[in-house]
């Protein structure tokens, strides 16, 4: 051909022409109307006309200069719009050379595609070309005008209820039974129809979407997603932390109407709480992390895969929490809808809270409604009722309640909220920022249970029985409060509608946002890390990773807990109380005494059943305690292991118990510097927190009864001779404690609780005790800080009066040995020096 005879200077031009021709061919698109041959022909023709033809009919060859001039064209074609301005100049010029005109296709007959080739919409592992019907439809929701993410939240309460709490007579005809209803679309009494349909439509578009795609988009779209569970068991714990802060620590630091705390860490009363329908237990883990051993929890939840996972409480001591599964106790099934379980749990809680009830109850019940998400409210109605019923059953007067709810469109659900509104001082519906905005979850928060709610509780109990009777039938309880009663309270109704519609609007925007994030995987929420940091700071939660507690040996833990205290102190033995040392118990008012039942030991708790004892001698090791009991980690006590007895003769039962003489560290709290009386009071509180009344198989833990030395005679009243099994029928001296169990006493510990140079006296004119400083001669009725005898002073200065052979402390014992200290000698000395 002619071109092969051209000079070498035309070689670069050839290559350029070839590239242009290839580009034109690749940019031409096959048309559904033409066969491939015509398409190829058109492409070739187009390439020929744009890049210069080799055919001899053209008459002459385009020179390199004319090609370069054409290549410098300023635009695609005259009048091209700016919609192509994002393409660089080279590509625009190439398209111009191929004869591109806006609105027309390439090719001889303009048969090429007219639109720009779209980016791939392929998502995940779907098949090529799969289209999810409904998902790609326009929602016409502007999610971009959502409020700026913030850690600050506002609470809106229902107005205070001025209606009297309904009584049995008034509620006698409130329950309405009718046909079971399984649609939600027409529930427009407490929400606008348009909003209701919109939120249901938005939820429905996700039905066809792969779950993993949904989760990934939700994670990117939610500005609060990175908060997660921090170092807790799950996200539920952080929801509770969130709401506890928002409601001014209403749960972990409840206050009376004057703002005074109802429980204090230094005082004897525990913070009692209940956690129902709450496995695996995130709510409880948060409360116990916040309050430690100053709180005691009771739990009821379904047994099985959704049970409490106490072994996963890494940040709190699960020994302070006691699951109880209703009828059958620890062997029950935990089904809150069974009336017998409700009664059993109520009785158990009241029996173990001095018949007062808990300070607050948390309920977080829910179950999978996969495929029926829009009916979640209807399917969960009995669960919601039973959680409300449990609150009215176990919460004390003035106590609080928090419960997860879902949609609240039906008159049945709104009726339940109305009853809470009547029974509590204040009620609100609240969605914390830790609850994902796209779901229907929110919480009903109730403050201050009123007096006189028993009849409402009984009414809800009867409704639950009716629901159980109608199960698996076509009938259902459709109303618990008549619509005219609810709507007669205009302020309640207005709040309910505002709350529902506001919640719907939030959901609609959040769902539309997730949909947008599914469609565009490049979208992200840029402030997630910043918001997380701000929230944790505000709520008082350390930004730490979740790590399992490290295991350690008892000796290392002991040295960690005593923090450099001289170890020799722990090997001190008590001074024997004899006729020669009797003067040491002066002044009498400085001393307390306790009945001994065995050798004193130190006990350390490393968590659960990892408990060890040590006799105080450096040469001896810590020995694993062979008892079935549990203690929180970082606990150090001074104890005796005592064999307790109950009953006499063949029916007599023996059990080994831990008797606490003094406390050093309680679940990480060092109390050694506090007054002896305060330490004993905290020990009593600690024992209440760790006791497990539902577990009779466990060895009990008790605190020694402490007597004032001047009241020692009270001890002898509780001594009697009893026949001990295995003692050949010979009666033995026994001391009976507060719980009607008795043990064989070995003597009496006498502990000085006032530090030198202070001592105690009794003012006859004021008829009260006072403190006197022997050095400065000062006296005061208030306890001076330096008069408190810390643990090591009490331990070092204690005396022990041994009740061995020759010591007669009960009239039925053998005669007194005249060379030993007698009961009469001690009582006479005390009486003389306590006046």
From Swiss-Prot:
Chain positions recorded as S-adenosyl-L-methionine binding sites: 234, 277-283, 335-336
Modified residues (Phosphoserine): 28, 31, 53, 66, 91
Gene Ontology, cellular component aspect: cytoplasm; nucleus
Basic and acidic residues composition bias: residue spans: 57-66
Localization of this protein: Nucleus
Swiss-Prot/TrEMBL keywords: Acetylation, Methyltransferase, mRNA capping, mRNA processing, Nucleus, Phosphoprotein, S-adenosyl-L-methionine, Transferase
Residues annotated as domain G-patch: 87-133
Residue ranges of the region described as Interaction with POLR2A: 727-835
Ranges spanned by the short sequence motif Bipartite nuclear localization signal, renumbered to the chain: 2-19
Major localization listed first in the record, in broad terms: nucleus
Binding site for substrate: 203-207, 218, 374-376, 439
InterPro entries per UniProt: G_patch_dom (IPR000467), mRNA_Cap_2O-Ribose_MeTrfase (IPR050851), RNA_MeTrfase_FtsJ_dom (IPR002877), RrmJ-type_MeTrfase (IPR025816), SAM-dependent_MTases_sf (IPR029063), WW_dom (IPR001202)
Catalytic activity: a 5'-end (N(7)-methyl 5'-triphosphoguanosine)-ribonucleoside in mRNA + S-adenosyl-L-methionine = a 5'-end (N(7)-methyl 5'-triphosphoguanosine)-(2'-O-methyl-ribonucleoside) in mRNA + S-adenosyl-L-homocysteine + H(+)
Enzyme class per UniProt: transferase
PROSITE patterns: G_PATCH (PS50174), SAM_MT_RRMJ (PS51613), WW_DOMAIN_1 (PS01159), WW_DOMAIN_2 (PS50020)
Any matching Pfam family: G-patch
Subunit structure: Interacts with POLR2A (via C-terminus).
Function: S-adenosyl-L-methionine-dependent methyltransferase that mediates mRNA cap1 2'-O-ribose methylation to the 5'-cap structure of mRNAs. Methylates the ribose of the first nucleotide of a m(7)GpppG-capped mRNA and small nuclear RNA (snRNA) to produce m(7)GpppRm (cap1). Displays a preference for cap0 transcripts. Cap1 modification is linked to higher levels of translation. May be involved in the interferon response pathway.
The protein's name in its UniProt record: Cap-specific mRNA (nucleoside-2'-O-)-methyltransferase 1
Organism: Bos taurus (Bovine)
């Amino acid at each position: 051909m002619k071109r092969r005879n051209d000079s070498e200077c035309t070689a670069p031009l050839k290559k350029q022409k070839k590239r242009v021709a290839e580009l034109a061919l690749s940019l031409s698109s096959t048309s559904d109307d033409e066969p491939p041959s015509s398409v190829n022909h058109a492409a070739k023709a187009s390439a020929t006309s744009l890049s210069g033809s080799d055919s001899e009919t053209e008459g002459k060859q385009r020179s390199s200069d004319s090609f370069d001039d054409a290549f410098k064209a300023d635009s695609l074609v005259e009048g091209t719009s700016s919609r192509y301005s994002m393409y660089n100049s080279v590509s625009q010029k190439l398209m111009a050379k191929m004869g591109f005109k806006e609105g027309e296709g390439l090719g001889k007959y303009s048969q090429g595609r007219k639109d720009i080739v779209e980016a791939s919409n392929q998502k995940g592992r779907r098949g090529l070309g799969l289209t999810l019907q409904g998902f790609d439809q326009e929602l016409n929701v502007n999610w971009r005008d959502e409020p700026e993410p913030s850690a600050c939240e506002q609470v809106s309460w229902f107005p205070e209820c001025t209606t009297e709490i309904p009584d049995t007579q008034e509620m006698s005809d409130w329950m309405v039974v009718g046909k079971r209803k399984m649609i939600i679309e027409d529930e427009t009494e407490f929400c606008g129809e348009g909003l209701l349909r919109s939120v249901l439509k938005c939820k429905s578009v996700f039905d066809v979407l792969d779950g993993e795609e949904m989760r990934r988009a939700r994670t990117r779209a939610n500005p609060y997603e990175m908060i997660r569970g921090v170092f807790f068991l799950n996200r539920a714990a952080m929801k509770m932390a969130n709401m506890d802060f928002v409601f001014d620590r209403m749960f972990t630091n409840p206050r009376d109407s004057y703002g005074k705390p109802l429980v204090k860490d230094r005082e004897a009363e525990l913070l009692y709480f209940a956690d129902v329908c709450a496995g695996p237990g995130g709510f409880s883990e948060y409360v116990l992390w916040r309050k430690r051993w100053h709180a005691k929890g009771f739990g009821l939840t379904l047994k099985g895969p959704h049970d409490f996972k106490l072994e996963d409480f890494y940040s709190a001591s699960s020994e302070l929490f006691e699951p109880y599964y209703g009828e059958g106790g620890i062997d029950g099934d935990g089904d809150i809808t069974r009336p017998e379980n409700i009664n059993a749990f109520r009785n158990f809680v009241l029996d173990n809270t001095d018949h007062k009830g808990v300070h607050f109850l948390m309920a977080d019940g829910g179950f999978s409604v996969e495929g029926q998400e829009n009916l979640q409210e209807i399917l969960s109605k009995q669960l919601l009722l039973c959680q409300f019923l449990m609150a009215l059953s176990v919460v004390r007067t003035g106590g609080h309640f928090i419960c997860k709810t879902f949609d609240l469109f039906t008159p049945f659900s709104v009726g339940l909220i109305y009853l809470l509104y009547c029974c509590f001082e204040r009620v609100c519906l609240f969605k914390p920022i830790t609850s994902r905005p796209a779901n229907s979850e929110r919480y009903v928060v109730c403050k201050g249970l009123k007096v006189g709610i028993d009849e409402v509780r009984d009414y809800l109990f009867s409704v639950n029985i009716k629901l159980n009777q109608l199960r698996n039938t076509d009938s259902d309880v459709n109303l618990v409060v008549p619509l005219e009663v609810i709507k007669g309270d205009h302020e309640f109704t207005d709040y309910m509608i505002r709350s529902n519609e506001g919640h719907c609007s939030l959901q609609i925007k959040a769902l539309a946002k997730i949909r947008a994030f599914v469609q565009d995987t490049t979208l992200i929420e840029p402030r997630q890390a910043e918001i997380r940091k701000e929230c944790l700071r505000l709520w008082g939660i350390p930004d730490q990773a979740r790590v399992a507690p490290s295991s350690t040996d008892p000796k290392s833990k002991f040295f960690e807990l005593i923090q450099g205290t001289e170890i020799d102190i722990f090997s001190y033995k008590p001074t024997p109380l004899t006729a020669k040392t009797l003067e040491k118990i002066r002044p009498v008012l400085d001393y307390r005494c306790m009945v001994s039942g065995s050798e004193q030991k130190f006990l350390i708790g490393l968590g659960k059943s990892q408990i060890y004892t040590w006799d105080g001698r450096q040469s001896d090791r810590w020995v694993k305690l062979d008892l079935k009991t549990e203690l929180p980690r970082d606990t150090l006590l001074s104890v005796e292991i005592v064999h307790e007895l109950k009953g006499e003769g063949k029916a007599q039962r023996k059990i080994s118990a831990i008797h606490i003489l003094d406390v050093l560290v309680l679940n990480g709290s060092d109390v050694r510097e506090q007054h002896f009386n305060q330490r004993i009071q905290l020990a009593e509180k600690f024992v209440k927190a760790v006791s497990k009344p539902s577990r009779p198989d466990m060895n009990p833990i008790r605190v020694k009864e402490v007597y004032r030395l001047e009241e020692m005679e009270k001890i002898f009243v509780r001594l009697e001779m009893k026949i001990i099994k295995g003692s050949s029928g010979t009666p033995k001296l026994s001391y009976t404690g507060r719980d009607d169990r008795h043990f064989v006493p070995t003597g009496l510990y006498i502990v000085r609780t006032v530090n030198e140079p202070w001592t105690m006296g009794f003012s006859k004119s004021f008829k009260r005790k006072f403190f006197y400083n022997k050095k400065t001669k000062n006296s005061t009725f208030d306890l001076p800080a330096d008069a408190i005898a810390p643990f090591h002073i009490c331990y070092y200065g204690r005396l022990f009066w041994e009740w061995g052979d020759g010591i007669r402390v009960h009239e039925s014992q053998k005669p007194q040995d005249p060379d030993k200290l007698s009961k009469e000698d001690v009582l006479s000395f005390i009486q003389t020096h306590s006046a």
